[in-house]
Regions:
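Conserved helicase RecA-like core
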Residues: 1-320
Length: 320
């Protein structure tokens, strides 16, 4: 019966075969051990932990059974969308900043979700208000763990764990081997699945790096000419700051080059609209901070342009 649930979910997602990382995770994450899964952004980690949940979620149970912590609103919504597309009987609720907390509470109380997906700050708010019972949660998943640390969510995540007395299992997913990982596992024996080295070799074979030299005063002109050369191929242009995204977007607009911008200072509907247009191909250029590098499912990106160099190797890994 349980295998039928997995097969049905895969059919609904139109996925014929899992990749090696997903197969390994399905085997280990459904067991009793804690799991650390190290794999690059965009490698399919979402399925790697959602599928095993189908083997452990209790049917006909109105309590919250699983908590998934993520660093961004977009990732929360993406995970929610994937789970809903599986066509299972269990319900979910997304909780994140910028969304009315009263609506989230109403959804939790009225819909009885088995899974709550949220950012650490908003989950902390719900717990402080007693909006759901944390004692029934048996599985904690932290996706994009390294990015959550980078965002300064260490203390919130640690505090949330102290409020989950019924916790039986933890799953941590990260695109880098962050040194803080052991702090958040160890509830049970821990299995570490490391697919970073394999993916690094694959990425090295897949990526072609090109350096474009330009004086600072000509940088926008150089970017404009490069994007014109790339034509209709989809491109993400990464900047290190929100104001830089806005400035580059406006300067390209002045040159009649159509692009969307994407950063954490934008209103949520505007961010969702920008991602939607980029994903469906109606816009070929997305100018973004590293927010677009945080586990978002953006298929078939042809080119990554580092308008500003990434601040460290981890940022480079996430962007690419």
């Amino acid at each position: 019966m349980k295998n039928e649930i997995i097969q049905s979910a895969l059919r609904n997602l139109k996925i014929k075969e899992l990749n090696p990382m997903q197969k390994a995770s399905l085997e280990q994450a459904a067991g009793r051990k804690d799991v650390i899964l190290l794999s690059p952004t965009g490698s399919g980690k979402t399925l790697a932990y959602l599928l095993p949940l189908l083997l452990t979620l209790k049917p006909n149970d109105d309590s919250v059974q699983v908590l998934i912590l993520v660093p961004s609103r977009e990732l929360a919504l993406q995970i929610d969308s994937v789970f809903k597309a599986m066509g299972t009987p269990w319900k979910t609720c997304c909780c994140y900043g910028g969304h009315p907390i009263a609506e989230e509470k109403k959804s939790i109380v009225g819909n009885h979700p088995a899974i709550i997906i949220g950012t650490p700050g908003r989950i902390t708010d719900h717990l402080s208000k007693g909006n759901f019972n944390p004692e029934t949660i048996e599985t904690l998943i932290i996706d994009e763990f390294d990015k959550s640390l980078e965002f300064g969510f260490h203390d919130e995540m640690a505090e949330i764990i102290t409020q989950l007395p019924g916790l039986k299992k933890r799953i941590l997913l990260s695109a880098t081997d962050a040194e803080e990982i052991p702090e958040f596992t160890g509830l049970n024996r821990t299995v570490k699945l490391d697919f970073l080295s394999d993916a690094s070799e694959e990425q090295g074979a897949r990526l072609k790096l090109m350096k474009v030299l330009s004086p600072s005063k000509d940088k926008i002109d150089t970017l404009y000419n490069l994007l014109c050369t790339l034509g209709s191929s989809s491109s993400i242009v990464f900047c290190n700051h929100r104001d830089a995204v806005d400035r580059v977007h406006q300067l390209l607009a002045d040159k009649k080059l159509s692009a969307e911008r994407f950063h954490g200072g934008m209103e949520q509907p505007d961010r969702e609209r920008a991602l939607y247009k980029f994903r469906n191909g109606s816009c070929h250029v997305l100018i973004s901070t590293d927010l677009a590098a945080r586990g978002l499912d953006i298929p078939e990106v042809g080119h990554i342009v580092h308008y500003h160099l990434p601040v460290n190797e981890e940022a480079f890994t996430h962007r690419n």
